[in-house]
A protein has these predicted regions:
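Intrinsic disorder at enzyme termini
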Residues: 1-19
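Glycine-rich flavin
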Residues: 32-116
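A non-catalytic, amphipathic alpha-helix used as a structural packing/dimerization or gating element
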Residues: 15-30
Length: 116
């Protein structure tokens, strides 16, 4: 049995998680698959991926409410789909969550409005 990028229905996932997983899968299919093995310049490619994740609305899954939509299941389904297509994309997504956590949990309102 080979792995599949399609999210499977799960008793632990709500419809919103399945929809988010499908968005992440579609992102991987159309933005990552063709270039997944072209990671000769990881710094440049990482910036490109993060920009695409932001434009695609997926970075919100790495940011806590009210500025984002993060909950554990959302975080997991996005990372699962990104990792299927590109470990660099998964790492870039995870790093955005690590970087934004300090601002979302302890930043001033001005910092949150600027960075999140």
């Amino acid at each position: 049995m080979s792995p599949s990028a399609s999210p499977a229905p799960d008793a632990f996932l709500e419809d919103r998680h399945l929809a988010l997983a499908e968005r992440a899968r579609s992102f991987g299919e159309y933005r990552l698959r063709a270039t997944a093995h072209d990671e000769a310049h990881p710094e440049e490619r990482t910036r490109q991926i993060v920009g695409q994740l932001g434009a695609g609305g997926l970075l919100g899954a790495a940011i806590a409410p009210p500025h984002g939509s993060m909950d554990l299941r959302s975080l997991v389904v996005v990372r699962e789909q990104l990792a299927y297509f590109s470990s660099l994309a998964d790492t870039a997504f995870a790093m955005q969550g690590l970087g934004s956590y300090a601002v979302s949990s302890a930043g001033t309102d001005a910092q949150k409005n600027r960075w999140l």
